Structure formats: structure tokens, C-alpha cells
Amino acid sequence: MSSLLLFNDKSRALQADIVAVQSQVVYGSVGNSIAVPAIKQNGLNVFAVPTVLLSNTPHYDTFYGGAIPDEWFSGYLRALQERDALRQLRAVTTGYMGTASQIKILAEWLTALRKDHPDLLIMVDPVIGDIDSGIYVKPDLPEAYRQYLLPLAQGITPNIFELEILTGKNCRDLDSAIAAAKSLLSDTLKWVVVTSASGNEENQEMQVVVVTADSVNVISHSRVKTDLKGTGDLFCAQLISGLLKGKALTDAVHRAGLRVLEVMRYTQQHESDELILPPLAEA
């Protein structure tokens, strides 16, 4: 069999459960650099589509790289269909986006993809900023999220600051955060998981709030003092994995939070500045 024939036999195409669209670093454990191994640990196949390719996070004293050009980004997405690699696709997740134009390109691709995958789960982590840093993405990204990705998503995972930006509402207490999250729900957007919600500082707790049209569940976890980056990306990877493995939403959120805490403690024990996934035997 010739190599040309071999690589054009689409029945042999590698398939994935998840397409993960977000940042990638050469050194470190953020974006797809932590999400992909975490998803694979859960026994799921994943294709990683980079939005930015960086040497490392900008917290180090040297930093190189930038956003993937639109032509490349759209080509990465198109190639997955050209390779016929999406027959078994179950979910698409998004994290850090490099430009507003990438968000528009992704939304157009998702809209077309849904025609062949009407049950596709689209989970958006609207990475915009946080309370400590403010907005740390380009200023036109929040509106691009509102206009293009939120109307397509079944679930989103904003932190408190991002929830405020997306809704224009003050969310510094639990009731206001819940109200803001409910204001985003629609026929398409079924749930909002608010990370880093107000917790009990005295008891060293943080809260994650799971909001649907019918219920609100508040999950408390121990607060770990750390500057580790990528914990949100890991949380989303664990969450989507749990959902695809059949866990109910609140249970999947709870388990994802516990796994993040486990990874953070393991990383601290190994005195690393970058997240380290424990082997499955220790998970």
C-alpha cells in the first residue's frame, strides 16, 4: 500500500472526544500544556488547538511568543475536518484566546460543526482577567465573548471578575453572583460555574457556585495559598472529563475541585513552580 493511499484512507483517521482550544507553552503547565495530559489521564482522546504559543507565562523574567495568526488558526480547525478526525467528537472547550478575530473564527467553525454534531457540548472558560490583575487580555475580547461564544456555549466557567465583566453587574457577594449568573442563562446556555466565588476567609475556604435554571449549588473547598498558574485550566479539563464520563454537573464540579487541590498539594510537596500531575496510582 502506497503512503499516499494510506494517508488518504479516512477510515483510518485518528478520532478524539474533545477539541481543546486555548494557549500552549513550551515551558510550564498552563492552557493545553496542563489540560491535554489531564484529559488523557481520564482515558479520553483530545486534539489541542493553540491560540497563542509562548515560551512560558509572562511571570518569568524572559518571555517569547504571541498569538497564532488567523490564517494558521483557521487552518488548524479546518484541518481537523479535512482529516475526518471529528466523527466521534463529543465536546469542544475553550480557554485563553489570543485575539477577538480568533473568537469569531472559532464561533463560525462551531456553528458549522453543530450541523453534524447537534449534541456537541461546548464549554467556554471566558478568560478575561481577575480581581487582582484586572483585565489582562486585549480590550476587545470581552465583547467578542459576549457576541460570538456565549450564544453557542452550553456551559461557562467565569471567575467572579469575569462574571462582572460579562454581565456588567457587581458580584462581590454570593447572592449578587448568583443573580448575575442566572442572567446569562438561555435556551442554549444551561449552566454557569462561578469559580473563586466569595468564601470564608477565616476558615480558609473558597467557593464554587453551580448555577442552572432550576438549582444553585455552592461547593466549598479548602483554600491553598499559592501562586501556581494553570489551576483554572486544570479545573476545566477535569470538569469536561467528568461530564463526558457521565458525572452529573455538580458532582463533576466537586470532583474537579478536589483534583485541583490534590495536584496543587502534590506540586508543593515536590517544590515545583509549575503544576505536576500525580501519577494515577496516587491520584
From Swiss-Prot:
Top-level enzyme category: transferase
Pfam families recorded: Phos_pyr_kin (PF08543)
Entry annotated with the keyword Kinase: yes
CDD domains linked to this entry: pyridoxal_pyridoxamine_kinase
Binding site for substrate: S23, H59, D233
Any one GO BP annotation for this protein: thiamine salvage
This protein's UniProt keywords: ATP-binding, Kinase, Magnesium, Metal-binding, Nucleotide-binding, Transferase, Zinc
The protein's name: Pyridoxine/pyridoxal/pyridoxamine kinase
Species annotation: Escherichia coli (strain K12)
